[in-house]
UniProtKB/Swiss-Prot annotation:
UniProt keyword terms in alphabetical order: Cytoplasm, Gluconeogenesis, Glycolysis, Isomerase
Biological function: Involved in the gluconeogenesis. Catalyzes stereospecifically the conversion of dihydroxyacetone phosphate (DHAP) to D-glyceraldehyde-3-phosphate (G3P).
Record GO biological process: gluconeogenesis; glyceraldehyde-3-phosphate biosynthetic process; glycerol catabolic process; glycolytic process
Complex formation: Homodimer.
Metabolic or biological pathway: Carbohydrate biosynthesis; gluconeogenesis; Carbohydrate degradation; glycolysis; D-glyceraldehyde 3-phosphate from glycerone phosphate: step 1/1
Location (main, coarse): cytoplasm
Active site: H99, E169
Homology family: Belongs to the triosephosphate isomerase family.
Family matches, as HAMAP family: TIM_B
Name the UniProt record assigns to this protein: Triosephosphate isomerase
A molecular-function term among this protein's GO annotations: triose-phosphate isomerase activity
Matches recorded under SUPFAM superfamilies: Triosephosphate isomerase (TIM)
Length: 254
């Protein structure tokens, strides 16, 4: 079974509803014109999901809509949280889970992330499990140990037949302008696939898409596309401008 390719944009805490609609009015036609092999998606803030959902539907676009996080319970006394049923009202296709900013700023633990991954998968929303090492980890030579643990613990609640996407984002490369070499990225992705084969099976590991994120731009997207174990991109800052993001999508799909 051939792995699917994805290029997702993570808007983080950027764009109002009006700004999101303006973005999509420009970006959706770009995507239609490029007609990429990759599935293209955006993960806006919670407050812009409604506007994005409306715009995507209005323009009859194939763009996937994603969320940046979710609570593992469907309802309850969890002030400030958002549930999967709430996301599904906006036809959300995927949800980012375990992003390094959630891990390090908000102290999300692997056990909680695992519950979120399982809940998303059971609800029919594709979980995108984000993993990555810090600069300290990289320099200490323990990158593979950290990534292996994040995969094993983060996927502990995933139903056996459910779909999942992995996004490798080295923390030291997010928003820093530092970019991992294509050789380094391929080595890490191949290692992650090996870990996935131990968690599941060799056959299933070959069906799981692994995305790369970390200062991805239009001028390095094509290089990552040549890596056999890089199945897509998770794009941060370069996804905020419709023309720039379209160039990233186009270059990854040359």
């Amino acid at each position: 079974m051939e792995r699917k390719s994805y290029v997702f944009g993570n808007w983080k805490m950027h764009k109002t509803a009006e700004e999101a609609k303006d973005f999509l009015s420009v970006f959706c036609p770009f995507v239609k014109e490029i007609s990429p092999a990759s599935i293209v998606g955006i993960a806006p803030s919670f407050t812009t999901l409604s506007a994005c959902c409306e715009s995507i539907k209005k323009m009859d676009s194939s763009i996937w809509l994603g969320a940046q996080n979710v609570h593992q319970d469907s309802s309850g006394a969890f002030t400030g949280e958002v549930s999967l049923p709430m996301l599904q009202e906006f036809h959300v296709n995927f949800v980012l889970l375990g992003h390094s900013e959630c891990r390090h700023i908000f102290h999300e633990e692997d056990s909680t992330i695992a519950l979120k991954v399982g809940a998303a998968a059971r609800s029919g929303v594709v979980p995108v499990l984000c993993i990555g090492e810090t600069l300290e980890t990289r320099e200490s030579g323990t990158t593979k140990d950290v990534l292996s643990n994040q995969l094993i613990l983060g996927l502990a609640q995933l139903p056996e037949t459910a779909s999942v996407i992995i996004a490798y984002e080295p923390v030291w490369a997010i928003g820093t302008g530092k970019v991992a070499s294509t050789a380094d990225v391929q080595e890490v992705h191949a290692f992650c696939r090996e870990v996935l084969s131990r968690i599941f099976s060799k056959e299933k590991s070959e069906t799981i898409s692994i995305l790369y994120g970390g200062s991805v731009k239009a001028d390095n997207a094509e290089g990552f596309a040549r890596c056999p174990d890089v199945d897509g991109l998770l794009v941060g800052g370069a996804s905020l401008d419709p023309q720039v993001f379209a160039n990233v999508v186009g270059n990854f799909n040359l």
